Design a protein with these regions (language model features):
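Membrane-integral, polyisoprenol-dependent glycosyltransferases
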Residues: 1-357
């Protein structure tokens, strides 16, 4: 006999609240990042641009992120047209789904009350709502990691390796949303499985090694395909120094994000400066189209090698197509250290949660 599941009316209320907070006002919002919106518009014009996440219609240079979140935004744009709200909509929806997932992650272990409180706090967290009102890819990254967490809890409770492989596969998908930032959960995942899984140490180690192999394969799948293509037949990898996705992942979107440093040097800039620079770069590309060969000039701050765009060899200076240079907190994330969350750059985002710790 099929057991009927009762709908938790409190969860419904929380999800309605989350949807209202995340969706309200996006139709007249000017908070979309023009840099990524320009990329989405380019990606709607050809499969070549779609696959490579090309910033410009000519397919000359990519954005500074892998393509998964932009693929989703592009699909929405193909349905609804390219508008500020249509590229923000998937981010808002992702946040609502994440709230629901948190409820279902917490409930089996800690009960309904804890699940409701957790979901409500996430739904009302100011920075989460603010980020979901932009087309920056963070909300989709959070959704990927929430799915991974849900699968991990399933793996621990059921003792099936398939759930564990699914969890690490989703982290790999997250890598293709925002690269190394997806790996921030890895230490917690590994430790939780080692402590929580009800099996022998040997089986735990073998399972985790297998899961890490799956993670690595999914993570580098798109990067390997792109880097294996002739440089003359694909866009230049924006913000990379060597026209390589893997170098972008471990350089500009990896170590430089962690340390707040830019290897190309230059003065420090705030995160708002980067947004303005992104918009300026999109204008620079549109205004520097080469009518003779149909190619676009690279964004300001990027310098293509001599010999024309077809050569596509050499270094890109100052970070290429994405947010540009700076040292010491170039991403507005404070100075590296154990108290980083309490510095002025991040305290406004993190301090709201201190009472719940």
């Amino acid at each position: 006999m099929i057991k009927k599941r009762k709908i938790d009316i409190f969860l419904v209320f929380i999800l309605v609240l989350s949807a209202a907070l995340n969706l309200y006002g996006i139709w007249n919002s000017d908070t979309d990042n023009a840099y990524y919106t320009a990329a989405v518009e380019s990606m709607t014009q050809s499969f070549h641009n779609f696959f490579y996440a090309s910033f410009d219609p000519a397919g000359f240079v990519t954005v500074d992120k892998p393509p998964v979140a932009l693929w989703i935004q592009t699909l929405f744009a193909l349905v609804f047209g390219v508008h500020g709200w249509s590229v923000v909509l998937p981010e808002a929806i992702a946040e609502v789904i994440s709230v629901a997932l948190l409820y279902f992650i917490v409930k089996p272990t800690f009960g309904k009350t804890a699940a409701r409180i957790s979901a409500l706090i996430m739904a009302c967290t100011p920075i989460a709502v603010a980020v979901s009102h932009t087309n920056n890819v963070d909300s989709i990254l959070v959704l990927c990691l929430m799915i991974a967490t849900w699968l991990l809890f399933k793996a621990v409770r059921k003792g099936k390796i398939g759930w564990l492989l699914g969890a690490f596969c989703m982290i790999g998908v997250g890598f293709n949303v925002k690269m190394l930032q997806a790996y921030m959960v890895l230490p917690a995942f590994l430790l939780f499985y080692m402590i929580g899984a009800k099996t022998t140490i040997r089986k735990k180690v073998v399972s985790l090694i297998t899961a890490v192999i799956v993670l690595a394969g999914v993570s580098v799948s798109w990067a390997v395909v792109v880097d294996s293509q002739p440089e003359s037949s694909r866009p230049y990898i924006g913000s990379s120094q060597t026209n390589s996705v893997l170098e972008l992942a471990f350089g500009y979107n990896g170590i430089q994000r962690l340390t707040g440093q830019n290897g190309a040097g230059g003065g420090g800039t705030s995160s708002s400066d980067h947004d303005q620079k992104n918009q300026q770069q999109s204008g620079d590309i549109e205004n520097n189209s080469d009518s003779a060969n149909g190619q676009m000039a690279p964004p300001s701050g990027a310098e293509m090698p001599s010999g024309g765009p077809d050569s596509r060899q050499g270094d890109v200076q100052s970070g290429g197509g994405g947010p540009g240079g700076g040292t010491g907190g170039m991403f507005g994330t404070g100075t590296p250290g154990p108290l980083r969350l309490f510095q002025s750059e991040l305290s406004g985002q993190a301090s709201w949660l201190i009472p719940f710790v």
